[in-house]
Amino acid sequence: MEKILVIDYGSQYTQLLAKRIRDLGVFSEVIQYDDNISLSNVKGIILSGGPDSVYNIDAPDISDEILNAELPILGICYGMQLIAKKLGGKVEQRGIAEYGKTKINITDQSLLFKKIPSTFNVWMSHKDMVTKVPEKFKITSLTSNNIISSFENESENIYCIQFHPEVRHTEFGIDILKNFIQGICGLKGSWTLMDFVENKIKEIKDTIGDKKAIIALSGGVDSSVAAVLTHRAIGNNLKAIFVNHGFLRMNEVEEVESTFRDYMGLNLTTVDAQERFLSKLKGVTDPEQKRKIIGEEFIRVFEQEAKKEEGCEYLIQGTIYSDVIESAKSGKKTFKIKSHHNVGGLPEDIDLKIVEPLKELFKDEVRSVGEILGLPREILYRHPFPGPGLAIRIMGEINDEKLTILKKVDNIFINTLKETGWYDKVWQAFAVLIPVKTVGITGDKRSYGYVAALRSVDSVEGMTADWSKVPFEILDLVSSRITNEVEEITRVVYDISSKPPATIEWE
């Protein structure tokens, strides 16, 4: 199968870049910069960005094998700086960093910029800059600060850009990638997610064989798709385990049990572990520690259930790639943002072998795979819900009282969005309980209650997100209902932070 090889230098956007390539119908493979490289069936190479400076002692390098492969190369951000230094150009720090939206001007013709306006906005994230291009290379664009934003040597098939075309904030970013992949590399695009499904089912069969597996089923999109995909591969050798850790939304246990038995016919066991999780989290306020504890307890519960199944050796998890990236597992040079319960919280002495069939996919791709597998819309288009659940939506220590309050608040918010037709318009919405009490008025008396924060974001893959512009009249209705129906809440606020710089979840 013809493919584009993406070499990862530690960018948070590396797998997003791979996804953009797949969106163009071309298979992409991501490898680390120091992995052994096979160029079989490779038709083009992309060097990702990364957090390093090319002048650091241990800075990731590029091999002569790649530069001499006579394949089209696209260097992005760090990849551009690396090529410049390697081929005799100059990279410097001049005290002018460029972060976020930046305007660039095309200064010379380039196949990379075919049918693209001469001036457009891009997404930058760099301190180092190329101040001199290698011999026989030409500058093709400059930023409004007169900084080199792209250069190339068409005869050598080497193209370099300082900005990130894979991020949606870059105008015409997909067109630039398309120009490279189709126009320069000559790939037409015939790979589909159907290919992924077929290959993954075969891979799961080959991995698990006639052994048994259990799945960490939550009722969310990711674990649901992982369950059906695995069930297609090994049939009744899959047992679904639904753990009620006490941090689920209102009525969620009953809804999940009903949905999976009605729609999917899975062999489903519900484990009530509420007291176990709460006791482990008593006195814990640090969000990283919460995630680690919850991740470990999940595994222990699954191990105990697996021991009841003779021959059970595998644990299926619905980890997707945004989870992996945020846990700093995507590249050796990636900076850690926060751990994910499916990734960063796994105990080292786990007795089960982990299988993560969706770990290469983003949320929208997971939904597309679910559609291919025939899952109902009400499962596929539920808003994302974190594995630790409401535990990371209560700031500070968790107890029964706070959980009850948050469940009521969240239920009001979500139901109001559904009633007003806004639930399907936003990517994710939820409530957060802030354990700070503020003054309010109840009747003729002063009162003190908690603050509830509402969070709603628009996104596609979860790597970047904008806060949702929910109409004020709907927010007004939600706020009024919460303060009237949940007596412990005296104040409601709406989170208008985008990702980046914020993350979607508060913890």
UniProtKB/Swiss-Prot annotation:
Residue ranges that the Swiss-Prot or TrEMBL entry lists as coiled coil: none
Gene3D superfamilies per the UniProt record, alphabetical: 3.30.300.10, 3.40.50.880, HUPs
GMPS ATP-PPase domain boundaries: 191-382
Function description: Catalyzes the synthesis of GMP from XMP.
Disulfide bonds: none
Organism: Petrotoga mobilis (strain DSM 10674 / SJ95)
Cellular-component GO terms for this entry: cytosol
InterPro entries documented for this protein: Class_I_gatase-like, GATASE, GMP_synth_C, GMP_synth_GATase, GMP_synthase, GMPS_ATP_PPase_dom, NAD/GMP_synthase, Rossmann-like_a/b/a_fold
List of catalytic residues: 77, 164, 166
Catalysed reactions, as listed in the record: XMP + L-glutamine + ATP + H2O = GMP + L-glutamate + AMP + diphosphate + 2 H(+)
GO molecular-function term, one example from the UniProt record: GMP synthase activity
Domain of life according to the entry: Bacteria
Positions of ATP binding: 218-224
Keyword annotations from UniProtKB, A to Z: ATP-binding, Glutamine amidotransferase, GMP biosynthesis, Ligase, Nucleotide-binding, Purine biosynthesis
Residue span(s) of domain Glutamine amidotransferase type-1: 3-190
EC number of the protein: 6.3.5.2
Name by which UniProt lists this protein: GMP synthase [glutamine-hydrolyzing]
Subunit (UniProt): Homodimer.
Pathway membership, UniProt: Purine metabolism; GMP biosynthesis; GMP from XMP (L-Gln route): step 1/1
Enzyme superclass (EC): ligase
NCBIfam families: guaA_Cterm (TIGR00884), guaA_Nterm (TIGR00888), PRK00074.1 (NF000848)
